[in-house]
Amino acid sequence: MVKTWEEFLKQEAKQPYFIELMEAVKDARAKGNVYPTEEDMFSCFRLCPYDQVKVVILGQDPYHGPGQAHGLSFSVQKGVRIPPSLRNIYKELKTDLDIEPADHGYLAKWAEQGVLLMNTSWSVEEGKAGSHKKLGWATFTDHVLEELNNYDKPLVFILWGNHAIKAASGITNPQHLLIKGVHPSPLAASRGFFESKPFSKTNAFLEEHGRKPIDWDLNEQ
């Protein structure tokens, strides 16, 4: 088991699949716009250090519009329009914990409290959803989740939609809580995402295991 994400990345960097993957992403960047930027590709690790993880929210792939993705699943930079899925997440937060929706979509405050906001694909070409999912990111994500499955404290995995549920099928350690539900996208949310109460369930589990709950409120104090 690793002790830091830096150690984990160094370990992966030696593996042939990862060398090929980084080359493929580099080639794609040379030909056009790829999101997020190279500096932000692993920012979920930077903002949520390995020894601080409490919750994992698994997304699919980064937003593919200019200026949106910055390496945290579901999150956008401040000043960027809040995407529809995140608006629905905010609606559920209001129903679940009576937290008013923030006027921005920047989720760094969650990450800094131990919420690992990761996607299963970690890069994407501009305007082409899912364009990098076959580059080798699935192997990388499996390895991240393997580390988390062996984590020494109980974690909560929030899995919205079949893609996330399938991707996390290797999370078998009984100490963890898996919250499985419908994806918050406008196409699916009305089929069971609303009133599923993932945020209060997460905090109840953390408190039960002696861990500090997440302050989900993103409004400027």
UniProtKB/Swiss-Prot annotation:
Q: Which UniProt keywords apply?
A: Cytoplasm, DNA damage, DNA repair, Hydrolase
Q: Does the keyword Lyase apply?
A: no
- Protein location: Cytoplasm
**Reaction(s) catalysed (UniProt annotation):** Hydrolyzes single-stranded DNA or mismatched double-stranded DNA and polynucleotides, releasing free uracil
Q: Does the keyword DNA damage apply?
A: yes
Tell me where it mainly resides: cytoplasm
Catalytic residues, chain numbering: D61 (proton acceptor)
Lineage, top-rank taxon, reads: Bacteria
The regions listed as transmembrane in this protein's record are none
EC numbers for this chain: 3.2.2.27
Gene Ontology cellular component list? cytoplasm
Q: Which GO terms describe its molecular function?
A: uracil DNA N-glycosylase activity
Ranges in coiled-coil conformation: none
Look up the record and give one Gene Ontology term from the biological process aspect: base-excision repair, AP site formation via deaminated base removal
What is the similarity comment for this entry? Belongs to the uracil-DNA glycosylase (UDG) superfamily. UNG family.
Task: Describe its function.
Answer: Excises uracil residues from the DNA which can arise as a result of misincorporation of dUMP residues by DNA polymerase or due to deamination of cytosine.
Task: Provide the protein name.
Answer: Uracil-DNA glycosylase 1
Source organism per UniProt: Listeria monocytogenes serotype 4b (strain F2365)
Gene name per UniProt:
ung1
